[in-house]
Amino acid sequence: MNKKLSFALLLIILVTASFFRVWRLDYQQTRTQGAWPTPASTPPGLFPDEAMNGNNAHEALGTFRTGEGFRVFYRENFGREGLFMNLQAMSMLVFGHTSFALRIMSALFGILTVLAIYLFTREYTKNEYTALIAGILLATSFWHVMFSRIGFRAIMAPFFLTAALWALYYVYNRLDSASHTHLVIISVLGGIFFGLGFYSYIAYRIAPLLLLPILYLLYKKAKKEKDSCIICLPAIYLFLAFLAAIPLGLYFVQNPQDFFGRTSQISIFAQPNPLKSFAENVGKTVGMLYYAGDFNWRHNIPGMPSLWWPVAIFFTVGFFDAIRKKYWLIPLWLTAMILPVAISSEGLPHSLRAIIMIPPVYVCAALGFYLIFSSVIGWFKKQEKRFADLEILLKVIQASIGTLGVVVLISAGANTYNSYFLRWAIRPEVASAYGGDSYLTGLFLKNAPRDIPKYVITSSVDSIDVTGRPMELEPILYASETYLPDPQGVKNIFYITLKQINTIECKKDCMIIPIDNLQPTLGALKKIVPDLKLCRADDYGLLVALPTARPGFKCSS
């Protein structure tokens, strides 16, 4: 393929990837008449896990400014590697204390992964067409778009691993070049990417297995050419990977209890029959691609397969084509990354835990697409010699088949747009899955008068956060910028449980926001503040209990 055409197509693919990952990622701060419209922000609200990341990022900004630096691990919410939160902290410096600042980092990694899969596929298969097809299929993948728009650290894993593998195969394919300077640079870069991957997601820890095929090829090449320093390049790669992973490794040595997180709690080894559970989980994860996807509204349209049915066909054909062509890395990658999913026993099928399977799935899909269309076009091309008088007709048929291929790729994007923006994003279940009114409550508190005491009441006893606060408060804490104790006092905001309502002081004025169990909470509050009125804020559509009516609220006794 012409290099200029290839570059132009790659640019179109990256623009497409950017559209699907960035469009409508900004947040609409108010809603109309208490009902969610087609949201200006997709996803709406902020999931507690995202908010916890944001609160840690806010905390990290403070330590960064005081010169204490960033943490490599955050123990809240079962523990998370710190790189993503630290990058989100840098994003907050640019975009402020917003949900966009948290999610734009995911979008950026999602876009970079599209570039990485193009580079890797081109290097591994040595086929420009297959590489471009892999790029456009990933750019328009509902599965990948979903996690490119949520502020979860796991989105980094596909990028770091794909980019790291690209670097090794790039080096291997150019060992005979006259100059090795650029190969040293790529080895350094690839090693850093591979090492940083350990900061992305716990499932990444199995990734070293994927280095074995290419390291073996490099070893064989080095044995043949003993006078060269071929072995130096993978040595540089591995050394840089080791250096990049050292801070996290040292943390785990000092804090071994954090190494497994909650893995042991959800492991199949806690089940009565682990082997049976493992087999069932493998079946569910494979089935997720074809007929029964993730049932969590946060990750998917419940039950919708992770692959659109034509892409599922391409994937199946491509998987066997990869084996036929001895592309052993692809089945190894899929097998290795299905293991972390299969040994867990919670919420399967689980598209988030399977996130590192995404690149090889779409490489297979690209292989299958190219094999099907190139074979059919090739067959008609061969007929030109047999039926010379039908040459024009046969060329028209070939062009039509090629056009059909383009239509299928465009349709994949249209299907994702329809599924994500028109079917999934507008559902009230999605708003509920992303915290419902929690983020709006935080924005309301942030903009409320500081001189009035504001009480947020919850009856939740869920204390996942090591600070002892329920996780459902995290979106409120993030949006109101009150995760740290000092801002709470300055802004006159108090977070209490139902058992602590006797601490409420509402002699002159106050605002009380019950975030769950509305009727029991109001009943208990009436005993303390008899004249309390239930009001709805005009701008936010939130229910707020007030002792007296105020402008901007519609109240009832």
Can you describe what each PLM-predicted range is?
Residues 13-14, 117-140, 324, 328-332:
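Transmembrane-helix signature of polytopic, membrane-embedded enzymes
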Residues 15, 104-126, 163, 313-320, ...:
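Transmembrane-helix motifs of polytopic, lipid-linked glycan transferases
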Residues 11, 192, 236-239, 369-419:
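Signature aromatic-anchored transmembrane alpha helix within multi-pass, membrane-resident enzymes
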